Protein backbone atom coordinates (compact mmCIF):
# COMPACT_ATOMS: atom_id res chain seq x y z
CA UNK A 1 0.00 0.00 0.00
CA UNK A 2 1.40 3.41 -0.98
CA UNK A 3 1.78 6.29 1.47
CA UNK A 4 -1.29 8.52 1.66
CA UNK A 5 -0.41 11.07 4.39
CA UNK A 6 0.96 14.32 2.95
CA UNK A 7 2.08 17.64 4.36
CA UNK A 8 -0.39 20.41 3.51
CA UNK A 9 0.93 23.36 1.48
CA UNK A 10 1.39 26.56 3.50
CA UNK A 11 -1.43 28.45 1.76
CA UNK A 12 -3.88 25.60 2.51
CA UNK A 13 -2.74 25.38 6.14
CA UNK A 14 -3.12 29.16 6.45
CA UNK A 15 -6.67 29.05 5.09
CA UNK A 16 -7.57 26.36 7.61
CA UNK A 17 -5.98 28.36 10.45
CA UNK A 18 -7.82 31.46 9.27
CA UNK A 19 -11.10 29.70 10.02
CA UNK A 20 -10.23 29.81 13.73
CA UNK A 21 -8.71 33.29 13.83
CA UNK A 22 -10.85 35.19 11.29
CA UNK A 23 -14.58 34.51 11.52
CA UNK A 24 -15.86 37.86 10.25
CA UNK A 25 -14.55 41.41 9.58
CA UNK A 26 -14.73 42.20 13.30
CA UNK A 27 -12.13 39.47 13.94
CA UNK A 28 -9.68 41.26 11.63
CA UNK A 29 -10.32 44.56 13.43
CA UNK A 30 -9.59 42.97 16.80
CA UNK A 31 -6.33 41.31 15.70
CA UNK A 32 -4.96 44.40 13.96
CA UNK A 33 -5.93 46.75 16.82
CA UNK A 34 -4.10 44.51 19.28
CA UNK A 35 -1.01 44.54 17.04
CA UNK A 36 -1.08 48.36 17.04
CA UNK A 37 -1.37 48.45 20.83
CA UNK A 38 1.58 46.05 21.18
CA UNK A 39 3.52 48.41 18.89
CA UNK A 40 3.12 51.14 21.57
CA UNK A 41 0.85 53.31 19.43
CA UNK A 42 -0.68 56.42 21.01
CA UNK A 43 -3.10 57.10 18.14
CA UNK A 44 -5.00 54.47 16.12
CA UNK A 45 -7.38 55.13 13.24
CA UNK A 46 -9.78 52.50 11.86
CA UNK A 47 -11.34 52.93 8.41
CA UNK A 48 -13.88 50.45 7.02
CA UNK A 49 -16.02 50.24 3.89
CA UNK A 50 -19.12 48.11 3.43
CA UNK A 51 -18.89 46.79 7.01
CA UNK A 52 -15.31 45.63 6.39
CA UNK A 53 -16.18 43.39 3.45
CA UNK A 54 -14.51 45.73 0.94
CA UNK A 55 -11.86 47.46 3.07
CA UNK A 56 -10.43 47.40 6.58
CA UNK A 57 -7.59 49.84 7.23
CA UNK A 58 -5.74 50.34 10.52
CA UNK A 59 -3.29 53.25 10.80
CA UNK A 60 -1.13 53.74 13.92
CA UNK A 61 1.86 55.80 15.06
CA UNK A 62 3.63 52.89 16.75
CA UNK A 63 7.26 51.82 16.53
CA UNK A 64 6.86 50.38 13.01
CA UNK A 65 8.81 47.50 11.47
CA UNK A 66 12.06 47.10 9.58
CA UNK A 67 12.23 45.65 6.08
CA UNK A 68 13.03 42.15 7.37
CA UNK A 69 10.42 42.24 10.15
CA UNK A 70 7.75 43.37 7.70
CA UNK A 71 8.40 40.30 5.56
CA UNK A 72 8.63 37.93 8.54
CA UNK A 73 5.37 39.16 10.07
CA UNK A 74 3.37 37.23 7.44
CA UNK A 75 5.00 33.89 8.24
CA UNK A 76 3.11 31.44 10.45
CA UNK A 77 4.18 31.40 14.10
CA UNK A 78 6.53 34.36 13.59
CA UNK A 79 6.28 36.67 16.61
CA UNK A 80 8.28 39.19 18.61
CA UNK A 81 6.25 38.61 21.78
CA UNK A 82 7.67 35.32 23.11
CA UNK A 83 10.74 33.13 22.64
CA UNK A 84 10.28 30.33 25.17
CA UNK A 85 7.27 28.34 26.39
CA UNK A 86 7.75 29.83 29.86
CA UNK A 87 7.10 33.28 28.38
CA UNK A 88 3.42 32.32 28.08
CA UNK A 89 3.10 32.73 31.85
CA UNK A 90 4.50 36.26 31.96
CA UNK A 91 2.68 37.80 29.01
CA UNK A 92 1.98 41.52 28.98
CA UNK A 93 1.20 41.81 25.27
CA UNK A 94 -2.03 41.17 23.36
CA UNK A 95 -0.63 38.82 20.74
CA UNK A 96 1.88 36.01 21.05
CA UNK A 97 0.98 33.21 18.64
CA UNK A 98 2.13 34.77 15.38
CA UNK A 99 -0.98 33.61 13.54
CA UNK A 100 -3.04 36.74 12.84
CA UNK A 101 -1.29 38.33 9.85
CA UNK A 102 -0.56 34.97 8.22
CA UNK A 103 -4.23 33.96 8.54
CA UNK A 104 -5.56 37.30 7.28
CA UNK A 105 -3.18 37.35 4.30
CA UNK A 106 -4.35 33.85 3.32
CA UNK A 107 -7.93 35.00 2.69
CA UNK A 108 -7.60 38.64 1.58
CA UNK A 109 -5.55 41.18 -0.36
CA UNK A 110 -3.25 42.83 2.18
CA UNK A 111 -1.08 45.92 1.81
CA UNK A 112 1.36 46.81 4.60
CA UNK A 113 3.14 50.17 4.87
CA UNK A 114 5.51 50.59 7.78
CA UNK A 115 8.52 52.60 8.95
CA UNK A 116 10.62 52.75 12.10
CA UNK A 117 11.85 55.99 13.63
CA UNK A 118 15.46 55.34 12.57
CA UNK A 119 14.79 54.38 8.93
CA UNK A 120 14.84 57.05 6.25
CA UNK A 121 12.24 55.31 4.09
CA UNK A 122 9.63 52.73 4.88
CA UNK A 123 8.47 49.48 3.32
CA UNK A 124 5.39 48.69 1.23
CA UNK A 125 4.51 45.00 1.11
CA UNK A 126 1.61 43.47 -0.85
CA UNK A 127 0.36 39.94 -0.14
CA UNK A 128 -2.48 38.07 -1.86
CA UNK A 129 -3.55 34.60 -0.75
CA UNK A 130 -0.34 34.05 1.26
CA UNK A 131 1.78 34.95 -1.80
CA UNK A 132 4.02 38.03 -1.64
CA UNK A 133 3.22 40.08 -4.74
CA UNK A 134 5.66 42.96 -4.20
CA UNK A 135 7.97 44.53 -1.62
CA UNK A 136 9.24 48.06 -2.28
CA UNK A 137 10.76 51.03 -0.50
CA UNK A 138 8.10 53.61 0.26
CA UNK A 139 7.93 57.08 1.79
CA UNK A 140 5.60 56.89 4.79
CA UNK A 141 5.45 58.38 8.32
CA UNK A 142 6.61 56.44 11.38
CA UNK A 143 4.23 53.69 12.33
CA UNK A 144 2.22 51.11 10.43
CA UNK A 145 -0.70 51.23 8.01
CA UNK A 146 -2.27 47.93 7.00
CA UNK A 147 -5.13 47.59 4.52
CA UNK A 148 -7.19 44.42 4.18
CA UNK A 149 -9.28 44.31 1.00
CA UNK A 150 -11.79 41.80 -0.37
CA UNK A 151 -12.01 39.60 2.71
CA UNK A 152 -12.69 35.90 1.91
CA UNK A 153 -12.21 36.60 -1.81
CA UNK A 154 -10.84 33.08 -2.34
CA UNK A 155 -13.38 31.34 -0.08
CA UNK A 156 -16.79 32.24 -1.58
CA UNK A 157 -18.64 29.97 0.83
CA UNK A 158 -17.27 31.87 3.85
CA UNK A 159 -18.09 35.22 2.24
CA UNK A 160 -21.66 34.12 1.59
CA UNK A 161 -22.08 33.30 5.28
CA UNK A 162 -21.41 36.90 6.28
CA UNK A 163 -24.47 38.76 7.58
CA UNK A 164 -25.90 42.07 6.39
CA UNK A 165 -23.81 45.24 6.60
CA UNK A 166 -25.76 46.41 9.66
CA UNK A 167 -25.06 43.18 11.55
CA UNK A 168 -21.36 43.11 10.63
CA UNK A 169 -20.99 46.79 11.52
CA UNK A 170 -22.52 46.08 14.91
CA UNK A 171 -19.94 43.35 15.55
CA UNK A 172 -17.15 45.71 14.48
CA UNK A 173 -18.40 48.39 16.87
CA UNK A 174 -18.50 45.81 19.68
CA UNK A 175 -14.85 44.82 19.13
CA UNK A 176 -13.78 48.45 18.72
CA UNK A 177 -15.48 49.47 21.96
CA UNK A 178 -13.89 46.62 23.93
CA UNK A 179 -10.39 47.58 22.83
CA UNK A 180 -11.03 51.32 23.29
CA UNK A 181 -12.44 50.85 26.80
CA UNK A 182 -9.40 48.81 27.83
CA UNK A 183 -6.99 51.54 26.69
CA UNK A 184 -8.16 55.07 27.54
CA UNK A 185 -4.51 56.17 27.28
CA UNK A 186 -4.71 55.71 23.48
CA UNK A 187 -6.62 57.89 21.01
CA UNK A 188 -9.01 55.94 18.75
CA UNK A 189 -11.19 56.86 15.78
CA UNK A 190 -13.56 54.80 13.62
CA UNK A 191 -14.85 55.76 10.17
CA UNK A 192 -17.40 53.76 8.17
CA UNK A 193 -18.06 54.65 4.52
CA UNK A 194 -16.66 58.12 5.17
CA UNK A 195 -18.84 58.73 8.25
CA UNK A 196 -17.16 59.21 11.62
CA UNK A 197 -18.66 56.86 14.20
CA UNK A 198 -16.19 57.48 17.02
CA UNK A 199 -13.52 60.06 17.84
CA UNK A 200 -12.05 59.17 21.24
CA UNK A 201 -9.27 61.36 22.68
CA UNK A 202 -6.79 60.23 25.35
CA UNK A 203 -8.53 60.46 28.73
CA UNK A 204 -9.31 58.54 31.93
CA UNK A 205 -11.51 55.45 32.37
CA UNK A 206 -14.63 57.33 33.37
CA UNK A 207 -14.42 59.82 30.52
CA UNK A 208 -13.76 57.04 27.99
CA UNK A 209 -16.88 55.17 29.14
CA UNK A 210 -18.90 58.37 28.81
CA UNK A 211 -17.48 59.18 25.37
CA UNK A 212 -18.43 55.75 24.05
CA UNK A 213 -21.84 55.24 25.65
CA UNK A 214 -23.12 58.81 25.77
CA UNK A 215 -23.02 61.93 27.93
CA UNK A 216 -25.64 60.80 30.44
CA UNK A 217 -23.69 57.66 31.33
CA UNK A 218 -21.47 59.53 33.77
CA UNK A 219 -24.23 60.19 36.29
CA UNK A 220 -25.16 56.48 36.31
CA UNK A 221 -21.74 55.21 37.45
CA UNK A 222 -20.62 54.12 40.91
CA UNK A 223 -16.82 53.75 41.35
CA UNK A 224 -15.38 50.44 42.58
CA UNK A 225 -11.90 50.20 44.11
CA UNK A 226 -10.21 47.28 45.88
CA UNK A 227 -6.55 46.31 46.22
CA UNK A 228 -5.56 42.87 47.53
CA UNK A 229 -2.69 40.45 47.12
CA UNK A 230 -4.74 38.41 44.66
CA UNK A 231 -6.00 41.21 42.42
CA UNK A 232 -6.43 44.94 42.12
CA UNK A 233 -9.98 45.85 41.11
CA UNK A 234 -11.00 49.23 39.73
CA UNK A 235 -13.72 50.58 37.50
CA UNK A 236 -17.41 51.31 37.75
CA UNK A 237 -20.81 49.66 38.10
CA UNK A 238 -24.11 51.18 37.05
CA UNK A 239 -26.64 52.32 39.62
CA UNK A 240 -29.40 49.73 40.11
CA UNK A 241 -32.15 52.04 38.86
CA UNK A 242 -30.40 52.26 35.48
CA UNK A 243 -30.21 48.49 34.91
CA UNK A 244 -31.01 47.48 31.33
CA UNK A 245 -32.99 44.74 29.65
CA UNK A 246 -29.88 43.54 27.78
CA UNK A 247 -26.33 42.62 28.79
CA UNK A 248 -24.75 45.01 26.28
CA UNK A 249 -22.99 47.19 28.87
CA UNK A 250 -21.09 44.51 30.78
CA UNK A 251 -17.30 44.57 30.44
CA UNK A 252 -14.55 42.68 32.24
CA UNK A 253 -10.90 43.52 31.56
CA UNK A 254 -8.01 41.48 32.95
CA UNK A 255 -4.59 43.09 32.49
CA UNK A 256 -6.14 45.40 29.86
CA UNK A 257 -7.60 42.47 27.91
CA UNK A 258 -11.37 42.05 27.42
CA UNK A 259 -12.61 38.69 28.72
CA UNK A 260 -15.88 36.80 29.15
CA UNK A 261 -16.42 35.05 32.46
CA UNK A 262 -19.87 33.72 33.45
CA UNK A 263 -18.44 32.93 36.90
CA UNK A 264 -17.29 36.49 37.60
CA UNK A 265 -20.46 37.84 36.01
CA UNK A 266 -22.40 35.84 38.59
CA UNK A 267 -20.38 37.55 41.33
CA UNK A 268 -21.43 40.96 40.03
CA UNK A 269 -25.08 39.94 39.68
CA UNK A 270 -25.07 38.45 43.19
CA UNK A 271 -23.81 41.74 44.62
CA UNK A 272 -26.93 43.46 43.18
CA UNK A 273 -29.28 40.94 44.81
CA UNK A 274 -32.55 42.58 45.82
CA UNK A 275 -31.72 45.82 43.98
CA UNK A 276 -32.72 44.99 40.41
CA UNK A 277 -36.05 44.72 38.66
CA UNK A 278 -37.06 41.38 37.18
CA UNK A 279 -35.08 40.45 34.04
CA UNK A 280 -32.83 43.50 34.33
CA UNK A 281 -29.05 43.40 34.12
CA UNK A 282 -26.58 45.79 35.76
CA UNK A 283 -23.99 47.69 33.76
CA UNK A 284 -20.37 47.29 34.79
CA UNK A 285 -16.92 48.27 33.55
CA UNK A 286 -14.42 46.45 35.75
CA UNK A 287 -10.64 46.33 35.39
CA UNK A 288 -8.72 43.57 37.13
CA UNK A 289 -4.94 43.59 37.48
CA UNK A 290 -3.49 40.19 38.39
CA UNK A 291 -0.10 38.52 38.28
CA UNK A 292 0.35 37.14 34.71
CA UNK A 293 1.66 33.92 36.29
CA UNK A 294 -1.71 33.35 37.99
CA UNK A 295 -3.74 33.21 34.76
CA UNK A 296 -3.77 31.20 31.54
CA UNK A 297 -5.08 32.96 28.43
CA UNK A 298 -3.90 30.42 25.87
CA UNK A 299 -7.07 28.31 25.95
CA UNK A 300 -9.17 29.84 23.15
CA UNK A 301 -8.34 31.29 19.71
CA UNK A 302 -10.05 34.60 20.52
CA UNK A 303 -8.27 34.85 23.91
CA UNK A 304 -11.49 35.96 25.61
CA UNK A 305 -11.53 33.05 28.07
CA UNK A 306 -9.10 33.00 30.98
CA UNK A 307 -8.37 30.50 33.73
CA UNK A 308 -7.49 31.87 37.18
CA UNK A 309 -5.42 30.11 39.81
CA UNK A 310 -7.75 31.15 42.64
CA UNK A 311 -11.10 31.85 41.03
CA UNK A 312 -13.12 31.39 44.23
CA UNK A 313 -11.14 34.02 46.11
CA UNK A 314 -11.47 36.43 43.19
CA UNK A 315 -15.23 35.83 43.18
CA UNK A 316 -15.49 36.72 46.87
CA UNK A 317 -13.30 39.83 46.52
CA UNK A 318 -15.26 41.10 43.53
CA UNK A 319 -18.64 40.56 45.16
CA UNK A 320 -17.52 42.19 48.41
CA UNK A 321 -16.00 45.25 46.73
CA UNK A 322 -19.11 45.93 44.62
CA UNK A 323 -21.43 45.49 47.61
CA UNK A 324 -19.28 47.92 49.57
CA UNK A 325 -19.44 50.50 46.77
CA UNK A 326 -23.20 50.13 46.39
CA UNK A 327 -23.66 50.41 50.15
CA UNK A 328 -21.53 53.52 50.26
CA UNK A 329 -23.56 55.01 47.42
CA UNK A 330 -26.86 54.28 49.17
CA UNK A 331 -25.74 55.80 52.48
CA UNK A 332 -24.25 59.03 51.17
CA UNK A 333 -23.28 60.59 47.85
CA UNK A 334 -19.83 59.69 46.64
CA UNK A 335 -17.33 62.52 46.20
CA UNK A 336 -15.40 61.78 43.03
CA UNK A 337 -12.26 63.90 43.19
CA UNK A 338 -11.13 62.63 39.79
CA UNK A 339 -14.36 63.73 38.14
CA UNK A 340 -13.86 65.67 34.92
CA UNK A 341 -15.77 68.94 35.18
CA UNK A 342 -16.35 68.93 31.44
CA UNK A 343 -18.42 65.74 31.55
CA UNK A 344 -21.62 67.37 32.70
CA UNK A 345 -23.09 69.87 35.12
CA UNK A 346 -24.69 68.36 38.24
CA UNK A 347 -28.20 69.35 39.20
CA UNK A 348 -28.52 72.36 41.46
CA UNK A 349 -31.83 71.81 43.20
CA UNK A 350 -31.49 75.05 45.15
CA UNK A 351 -31.61 77.23 42.05
CA UNK A 352 -33.65 74.94 39.80
CA UNK A 353 -37.11 76.21 38.93
CA UNK A 354 -40.00 73.91 39.61
CA UNK A 355 -41.40 72.13 36.58
CA UNK A 356 -44.86 73.06 35.42
CA UNK A 357 -47.40 70.44 36.48
CA UNK A 358 -48.19 67.93 33.76
CA UNK A 359 -51.83 67.33 32.91
CA UNK A 360 -52.56 63.79 31.83
CA UNK A 361 -55.43 63.35 29.39
CA UNK A 362 -57.28 60.09 28.92
CA UNK A 363 -57.53 59.92 25.13
CA UNK A 364 -59.99 57.04 25.32
CA UNK A 365 -62.53 58.83 27.55
CA UNK A 366 -65.91 59.17 25.85
CA UNK A 367 -68.66 60.86 27.89
CA UNK A 368 -71.27 59.57 25.45
CA UNK A 369 -70.20 55.97 25.64
CA UNK A 370 -72.77 53.62 27.09
CA UNK A 371 -71.66 52.31 30.47
CA UNK A 372 -72.74 48.86 29.44
CA UNK A 373 -70.54 48.92 26.38
CA UNK A 374 -69.17 45.57 25.45
CA UNK A 375 -65.75 47.02 24.66
CA UNK A 376 -62.85 46.20 26.88
CA UNK A 377 -59.79 48.42 26.98
CA UNK A 378 -56.13 47.47 27.37
CA UNK A 379 -53.62 49.75 29.03
CA UNK A 380 -52.00 50.42 25.68
CA UNK A 381 -55.02 52.40 24.48
CA UNK A 382 -56.58 49.89 22.05
CA UNK A 383 -60.15 48.68 22.43
CA UNK A 384 -60.94 45.02 21.89
CA UNK A 385 -64.58 44.12 21.35
CA UNK A 386 -65.84 41.26 23.37
CA UNK A 387 -66.48 38.47 20.90
CA UNK A 388 -69.70 36.55 20.69
CA UNK A 389 -69.66 33.37 22.72
CA UNK A 390 -67.20 31.02 21.08
CA UNK A 391 -67.68 27.29 20.56
CA UNK A 392 -65.49 26.48 23.55
CA UNK A 393 -68.06 28.12 25.84
CA UNK A 394 -70.62 25.50 25.00
CA UNK A 395 -68.06 22.81 25.74
CA UNK A 396 -66.86 24.41 28.97
CA UNK A 397 -70.19 25.87 29.95
CA UNK A 398 -69.22 25.60 33.59
CA UNK A 399 -67.15 28.74 33.19
CA UNK A 400 -70.20 30.96 32.95
CA UNK A 401 -72.82 28.86 34.70
CA UNK A 402 -73.18 27.84 38.27
CA UNK A 403 -70.83 25.02 39.16
CA UNK A 404 -72.38 21.59 39.63
CA UNK A 405 -69.95 20.67 42.41
CA UNK A 406 -70.79 20.75 46.09
CA UNK A 407 -68.61 23.86 46.56
CA UNK A 408 -70.33 27.21 46.10
CA UNK A 409 -67.83 29.63 44.54
CA UNK A 410 -69.85 32.55 45.97
CA UNK A 411 -68.86 31.53 49.47
CA UNK A 412 -65.11 31.35 48.75
CA UNK A 413 -63.20 34.10 50.51
CA UNK A 414 -61.41 36.16 47.86
CA UNK A 415 -58.43 38.46 48.45
CA UNK A 416 -59.63 41.68 50.03
CA UNK A 417 -57.05 43.90 48.26
CA UNK A 418 -58.43 46.61 46.03
CA UNK A 419 -57.41 46.72 42.41
CA UNK A 420 -55.35 49.89 42.02
CA UNK A 421 -56.36 50.32 38.40
CA UNK A 422 -58.91 48.73 36.12
CA UNK A 423 -56.84 47.06 33.42
CA UNK A 424 -59.60 47.12 30.86
CA UNK A 425 -61.33 50.38 31.74
CA UNK A 426 -64.69 48.69 32.39
CA UNK A 427 -66.58 48.51 35.62
CA UNK A 428 -66.34 45.27 37.51
CA UNK A 429 -69.53 43.40 36.92
CA UNK A 430 -71.58 42.87 40.02
CA UNK A 431 -72.28 39.29 39.03
CA UNK A 432 -71.48 35.90 40.34
CA UNK A 433 -67.78 35.08 40.07
CA UNK A 434 -67.22 32.41 37.43
CA UNK A 435 -63.43 32.80 37.77
CA UNK A 436 -61.03 33.65 40.55
CA UNK A 437 -57.28 34.21 40.99
CA UNK A 438 -54.71 32.14 42.85
CA UNK A 439 -51.59 33.94 44.12
CA UNK A 440 -52.23 36.72 41.58
CA UNK A 441 -50.75 34.39 38.98
CA UNK A 442 -53.33 31.85 37.87
CA UNK A 443 -56.93 32.24 36.75
CA UNK A 444 -59.13 29.35 37.90
CA UNK A 445 -62.50 28.48 36.43
CA UNK A 446 -64.83 25.53 36.86
CA UNK A 447 -65.78 23.06 34.16
CA UNK A 448 -68.46 20.40 34.06
CA UNK A 449 -65.64 17.88 34.16
CA UNK A 450 -63.47 19.61 36.75
CA UNK A 451 -61.27 22.70 37.07
CA UNK A 452 -59.43 24.82 34.48
CA UNK A 453 -56.21 26.61 35.61
CA UNK A 454 -54.74 29.30 33.33
CA UNK A 455 -51.40 31.13 33.57
CA UNK A 456 -52.55 34.73 33.20
CA UNK A 457 -49.30 36.10 31.73
CA UNK A 458 -48.91 33.35 29.13
CA UNK A 459 -52.57 33.57 28.19
CA UNK A 460 -52.46 37.32 27.68
CA UNK A 461 -49.19 36.97 25.74
CA UNK A 462 -50.85 34.50 23.35
CA UNK A 463 -53.81 36.87 22.84
CA UNK A 464 -51.61 39.90 22.12
CA UNK A 465 -49.20 37.90 19.95
CA UNK A 466 -51.91 36.76 17.55
CA UNK A 467 -53.42 40.25 17.47
CA UNK A 468 -50.04 41.84 16.66
CA UNK A 469 -49.11 39.20 14.11
CA UNK A 470 -52.41 39.68 12.31
CA UNK A 471 -51.96 43.46 12.16
CA UNK A 472 -48.41 43.16 10.79
CA UNK A 473 -48.98 40.43 8.21
CA UNK A 474 -52.03 42.09 6.66
CA UNK A 475 -50.36 45.53 6.88
CA UNK A 476 -53.20 46.82 9.02
CA UNK A 477 -51.02 48.22 11.80
CA UNK A 478 -52.20 51.71 12.71
CA UNK A 479 -49.80 54.35 13.96
CA UNK A 480 -50.73 57.13 16.36
CA UNK A 481 -48.88 60.34 15.50
CA UNK A 482 -47.28 62.12 18.45
CA UNK A 483 -47.78 65.83 19.02
CA UNK A 484 -44.17 66.11 20.17
CA UNK A 485 -41.63 63.56 18.85
CA UNK A 486 -39.98 61.27 21.38
CA UNK A 487 -36.20 61.71 21.71
CA UNK A 488 -34.64 58.55 23.16
CA UNK A 489 -30.98 58.01 24.07
CA UNK A 490 -29.23 54.77 23.08
CA UNK A 491 -25.59 53.75 22.84
CA UNK A 492 -23.94 53.02 19.48
CA UNK A 493 -24.47 49.28 19.76
CA UNK A 494 -28.20 49.71 20.41
CA UNK A 495 -28.55 52.25 17.58
CA UNK A 496 -27.05 49.77 15.11
CA UNK A 497 -29.46 47.13 16.37
CA UNK A 498 -32.42 49.47 15.83
CA UNK A 499 -31.21 50.20 12.30
CA UNK A 500 -31.15 46.48 11.66
CA UNK A 501 -34.79 45.97 12.69
CA UNK A 502 -36.11 49.40 11.65
CA UNK A 503 -38.11 48.12 8.67
CA UNK A 504 -39.84 45.45 10.75
CA UNK A 505 -40.57 47.95 13.52
CA UNK A 506 -42.23 50.30 11.06
CA UNK A 507 -44.59 47.48 10.08
CA UNK A 508 -45.89 47.45 13.66
CA UNK A 509 -46.72 51.17 13.60
CA UNK A 510 -43.48 52.86 14.69
CA UNK A 511 -42.47 55.95 12.70
CA UNK A 512 -38.81 56.97 12.96
CA UNK A 513 -38.00 60.57 12.05
CA UNK A 514 -34.26 59.99 12.41
CA UNK A 515 -31.75 57.54 13.86
CA UNK A 516 -28.50 59.26 14.78
CA UNK A 517 -25.31 58.20 16.54
CA UNK A 518 -26.75 58.21 20.07
CA UNK A 519 -30.29 59.51 19.60
CA UNK A 520 -33.47 58.14 18.08
CA UNK A 521 -36.40 60.40 17.19
CA UNK A 522 -39.84 58.77 17.00
CA UNK A 523 -42.85 60.64 15.63
CA UNK A 524 -45.36 57.78 15.64
CA UNK A 525 -46.01 54.68 17.73
CA UNK A 526 -48.37 51.67 17.50
CA UNK A 527 -51.84 52.22 18.92
CA UNK A 528 -51.34 49.24 21.23
CA UNK A 529 -48.79 51.08 23.39
CA UNK A 530 -48.52 54.39 25.19
CA UNK A 531 -45.68 56.93 25.06
CA UNK A 532 -44.44 55.97 28.52
CA UNK A 533 -43.93 52.36 27.42
CA UNK A 534 -41.93 53.04 24.24
CA UNK A 535 -38.43 53.17 25.70
CA UNK A 536 -38.94 50.04 27.83
CA UNK A 537 -40.39 48.13 24.88
CA UNK A 538 -37.52 49.12 22.57
CA UNK A 539 -34.96 48.10 25.20
CA UNK A 540 -36.66 44.72 25.49
CA UNK A 541 -36.77 44.37 21.70
CA UNK A 542 -33.03 45.06 21.47
CA UNK A 543 -32.36 42.51 24.21
CA UNK A 544 -34.47 39.88 22.42
CA UNK A 545 -32.80 40.46 19.06
CA UNK A 546 -29.36 40.20 20.67
CA UNK A 547 -30.04 36.62 21.70
CA UNK A 548 -28.58 34.31 19.08
CA UNK A 549 -30.71 31.17 19.31
CA UNK A 550 -29.49 28.59 16.74
CA UNK A 551 -32.80 26.72 16.37
CA UNK A 552 -34.87 29.88 16.24
CA UNK A 553 -36.72 29.69 12.92
CA UNK A 554 -38.95 32.70 13.53
CA UNK A 555 -38.76 35.63 11.18
CA UNK A 556 -38.19 39.20 12.33
CA UNK A 557 -41.94 39.76 12.21
CA UNK A 558 -42.64 36.81 14.49
CA UNK A 559 -39.88 37.81 16.86
CA UNK A 560 -41.19 41.37 16.99
CA UNK A 561 -44.71 40.19 17.75
CA UNK A 562 -43.43 37.80 20.43
CA UNK A 563 -41.28 40.44 22.09
CA UNK A 564 -43.97 43.13 22.07
CA UNK A 565 -46.64 40.73 23.32
CA UNK A 566 -44.41 39.46 26.12
CA UNK A 567 -43.60 43.02 27.23
CA UNK A 568 -47.19 44.27 27.09
CA UNK A 569 -48.94 41.27 28.65
CA UNK A 570 -50.24 41.41 32.20
CA UNK A 571 -47.58 40.17 34.61
CA UNK A 572 -47.73 37.51 37.28
CA UNK A 573 -48.42 39.24 40.57
CA UNK A 574 -51.03 41.59 39.08
CA UNK A 575 -54.41 41.52 40.79
CA UNK A 576 -57.27 41.19 38.28
CA UNK A 577 -60.96 41.68 38.89
CA UNK A 578 -63.59 39.27 37.58
CA UNK A 579 -64.22 41.20 34.35
CA UNK A 580 -60.51 41.24 33.54
CA UNK A 581 -60.12 37.56 34.29
CA UNK A 582 -63.13 36.66 32.15
CA UNK A 583 -61.91 38.84 29.29
CA UNK A 584 -58.55 37.04 29.15
CA UNK A 585 -60.30 33.66 29.23
CA UNK A 586 -62.72 34.65 26.45
CA UNK A 587 -59.98 36.06 24.22
CA UNK A 588 -57.66 33.11 24.86
CA UNK A 589 -60.10 30.51 23.57
CA UNK A 590 -60.77 32.65 20.51
CA UNK A 591 -57.09 32.24 19.54
CA UNK A 592 -55.87 29.77 16.94
CA UNK A 593 -53.50 28.03 19.38
CA UNK A 594 -54.72 28.69 22.93
CA UNK A 595 -52.87 25.77 24.52
CA UNK A 596 -49.35 27.16 24.00
CA UNK A 597 -47.77 30.56 24.49
CA UNK A 598 -45.70 32.04 21.61
CA UNK A 599 -42.67 30.60 23.41
CA UNK A 600 -44.12 27.05 23.37
CA UNK A 601 -44.99 27.07 27.08
CA UNK A 602 -48.18 25.52 28.46
CA UNK A 603 -50.91 28.13 28.91
CA UNK A 604 -53.52 26.12 30.84
CA UNK A 605 -54.15 22.75 32.41
CA UNK A 606 -57.24 20.91 33.62
CA UNK A 607 -57.92 18.89 36.74
CA UNK A 608 -60.80 16.44 36.37
CA UNK A 609 -63.28 15.48 39.09
CA UNK A 610 -61.89 11.93 39.01
CA UNK A 611 -58.40 13.28 39.76
CA UNK A 612 -59.82 15.33 42.61
CA UNK A 613 -61.65 12.27 43.95
CA UNK A 614 -58.37 10.32 43.97
CA UNK A 615 -56.76 13.07 46.05
CA UNK A 616 -59.40 12.55 48.74
CA UNK A 617 -59.62 8.77 48.48
Curated annotation (Swiss-Prot):
Transmembrane segments: none
Molecular function (Gene Ontology), one example: ATP hydrolysis activity
Keywords, sorted A to Z: DNA damage, DNA repair
Xref: InterPro entries: DNA_mismatch_repair_CS, DNA_mismatch_repair_MutL, DNA_mismatch_S5_2-like, HATPase_C_sf, MutL/Mlh/PMS, MutL/Mlh/Pms-like, MutL_C, MutL_C_dimsub
One GO term describing the cellular component: mismatch repair complex
Stated family: Belongs to the DNA mismatch repair MutL/HexB family.
HAMAP family on file: DNA_mis_repair
Function: This protein is involved in the repair of mismatches in DNA. It is required for dam-dependent methyl-directed DNA mismatch repair. May act as a 'molecular matchmaker', a protein that promotes the formation of a stable complex between two or more DNA-binding proteins in an ATP-dependent manner without itself being part of a final effector complex.
Record protein name field: DNA mismatch repair protein MutL
Taxonomic source organism: Christiangramia forsetii (strain DSM 17595 / CGMCC 1.15422 / KT0803)
Gene symbol of the encoding locus: mutL
Amino acid sequence: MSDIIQLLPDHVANQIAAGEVVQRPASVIKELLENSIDAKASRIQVVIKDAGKTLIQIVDDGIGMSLTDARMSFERHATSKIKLADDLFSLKTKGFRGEALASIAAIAHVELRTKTENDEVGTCLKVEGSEVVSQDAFVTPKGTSISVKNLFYNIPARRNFLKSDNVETRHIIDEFQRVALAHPNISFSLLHNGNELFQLPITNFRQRITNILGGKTNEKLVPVEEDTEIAKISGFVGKPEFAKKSRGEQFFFVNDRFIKSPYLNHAVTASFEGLLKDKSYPSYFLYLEVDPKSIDINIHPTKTEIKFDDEHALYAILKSSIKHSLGQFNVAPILDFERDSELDTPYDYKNKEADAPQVEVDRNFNPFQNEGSSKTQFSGGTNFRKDKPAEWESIYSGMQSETDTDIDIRHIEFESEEVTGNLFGAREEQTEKSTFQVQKKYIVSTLKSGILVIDQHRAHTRVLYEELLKNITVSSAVSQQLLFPLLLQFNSHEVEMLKEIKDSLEQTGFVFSSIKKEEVEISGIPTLISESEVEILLEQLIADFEKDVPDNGFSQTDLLAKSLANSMAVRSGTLLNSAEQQHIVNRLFACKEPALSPFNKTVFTTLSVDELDKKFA
